[in-house]
């Protein structure tokens, strides 16, 4: 009798364990939880960034927007996100033909779409246009190109398995580069002297009355520094006062800069993504 009770107890424990295993079974993590995994990659629908810029050139250059009605996809790689706080409510993507901004009305994007991540964007029903002639994908806002909602972004984007920055070319920046073609690209600037460097001035300090620094937008918006003495109407280093590296002291030595070369009309604006995008040259 005792043996029978022991046998029944063992069976009961085994059944309970099996039920618990079933109840607490780990979720299927083969697909990313962020984005829309139902978007199927279709080579016949894919367009390049250069093709988009060409097809919507008037909307981009004219400061307007146009809604994309064709069933098209963009296969691209993320080259800039909001991890360092200098890129705000947008990411920058690039393919072998060009680069552009994607406006998203949300923050904390970087844990889901890191630099080097390949993504597929369903373009149908999104808008394309230009902000200061910088090509941007997003949504309509007061008759111009603006940011899309995070809900819409997740519906129109799929994260792909590939994560490889080696496929992306880093251009050696030249101030004479064609802005229509190269704006938005990941670039490298060699042997650069950053303006306002005196051993104590930081990249983007909070605004103080009497400052000689150039602030763009609100007093605590962006700080512009010249590069190699070029006119600030032609080329600036643009850093947010809210960037994680805003308090970095500007090197007084020549540096190599890595960043995103965006444009605002005729002005090149270099956006660094993290403190290590500034590398002091070895002597």
Explain the meaning of each model-derived region.
Residues 1-5, 21:
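Positively charged n-region of N-terminal signal peptides that target proteins for export
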Residues 15-18:
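C-terminal motif of bacterial Sec signal peptides marking the signal peptidase cleavage site
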């Amino acid at each position: 009798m005792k043996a029978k009770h022991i046998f029944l107890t063992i069976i009961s424990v085994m059944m309970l364990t099996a039920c618990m295993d079933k109840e607490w079974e780990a979720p299927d993590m083969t697909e990313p939880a962020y984005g829309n995994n139902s978007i199927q990659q279709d080579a016949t629908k894919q367009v390049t960034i250069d093709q988009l810029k060409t097809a919507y050139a008037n909307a981009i250059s004219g400061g307007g927007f146009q809604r994309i009605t064709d069933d098209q996809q963009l296969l691209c790689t993320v080259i800039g996100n909001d991890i360092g706080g200098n890129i705000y409510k947008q990411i920058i993507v690039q393919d072998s033909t060009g680069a552009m901004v994607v406006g998203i009305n949300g923050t904390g994007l970087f844990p889901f779409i890191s630099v080097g991540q390949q993504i597929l964007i369903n373009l149908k029903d999104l808008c394309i246009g230009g902000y200061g002639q910088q090509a941007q994908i997003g949504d309509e806002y007061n008759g111009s190109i603006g940011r899309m909602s995070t809900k819409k972004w997740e519906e129109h984007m799929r994260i792909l398995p590939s994560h490889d920055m080696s496929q992306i070319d880093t251009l050696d920046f030249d101030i004479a580069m064609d802005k229509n073609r190269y704006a938005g690209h990941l670039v490298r600037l060699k042997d650069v002297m950053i303006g306002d460097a005196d051993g104590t001035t930081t990249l983007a300090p909070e605004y103080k009355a009497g400052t000689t620094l150039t602030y763009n937008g609100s007093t605590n918006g962006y700080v512009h520094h010249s590069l190699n003495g070029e006119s600030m109407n032609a080329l600036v280093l643009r850093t947010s006062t809210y960037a994680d590296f805003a308090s970095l002291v500007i090197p007084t030595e020549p540096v190599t800069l890595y960043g995103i070369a965006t444009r605002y009309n005729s002005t090149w604006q270099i956006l660094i993504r993290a403190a290590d995008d500034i590398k002091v040259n070895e002597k």
